[in-house]
């Protein structure tokens, strides 16, 4: 799998195209699997495929919140997101295992379409708008697109492993 830095070397259009096909890629990986398989965790500490899809849906919402804030505000300080605790807390609080995978995927698709429409509508100078990320420091909108592109691929690999019963 490529690193975040390797994704940063791709053209912006290439990264946007990868983001556009993200929901289709997720759908292709989970297609044909029943709820029992999609709800099965590969081990005690890794997510079930259904939880991964719900996480991707929720991260897309967080991304749009951050992007719109970056356009509306000069160099906002973003609210902390502890990658070690927040995703697991969301999975529990939002009851990911009780969610319908198809509905979560449809919501992810809608949110991603909104994100792509927003991003494609930006003026060239707006791509350099930035925010202060709590752990990564100053990040531009372009940096967030790079990170989200990597994030999709990371979770696609996680989905494949989970469906194969591997952590």
Feature annotation, model-predicted:
Residues 16-18, 23-25, 32, 94-101, ...:
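Small-residue-biased structural context
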Residues 28, 32-33, 41-43:
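A glycine-rich, hydrophobic loop/mini-helix early in the fold
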Residues 1-21:
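Extreme N-terminal tail/first-helix region
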Residues 2-5, 39-87, 113-116, 120, ...:
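Short, contiguous alpha-helical
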Residues 17-24, 87-128:
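Acidic/histidine-rich alpha-helical segments that form the ligand environment
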Residues 11, 19-27, 60-64, 152:
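A general secondary-structure boundary signal
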């Amino acid at each position: 799998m490529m690193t975040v830095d390797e994704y940063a070397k791709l053209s912006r259009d290439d990264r946007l195209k990868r983001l556009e096909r993200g929901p289709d890629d997720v759908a292709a990986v989970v297609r044909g699997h029943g709820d029992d398989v999609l709800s099965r965790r590969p081990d005690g500490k890794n997510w079930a495929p259904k939880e991964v899809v719900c996480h991707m849906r929720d991260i897309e919402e967080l991304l749009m919140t951050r992007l719109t804030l970056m356009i509306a505000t000069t160099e906002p300080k973003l609210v902390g997101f502890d990658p070690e605790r927040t995703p697991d807390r969301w999975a529990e609080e939002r009851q990911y295992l009780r969610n319908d995978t198809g509905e979560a995927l449809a919501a992810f698709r809608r949110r991603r379409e909104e994100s792509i429409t927003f991003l494609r509508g930006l003026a060239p100078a707006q791509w350099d708008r930035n925010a202060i990320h709590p752990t990564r420091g100053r990040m531009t909108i372009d940096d967030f697109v790079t990170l989200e592109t990597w994030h999709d691929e990371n979770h696609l690999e996680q989905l494949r492993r989970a469906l194969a019963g591997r952590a």
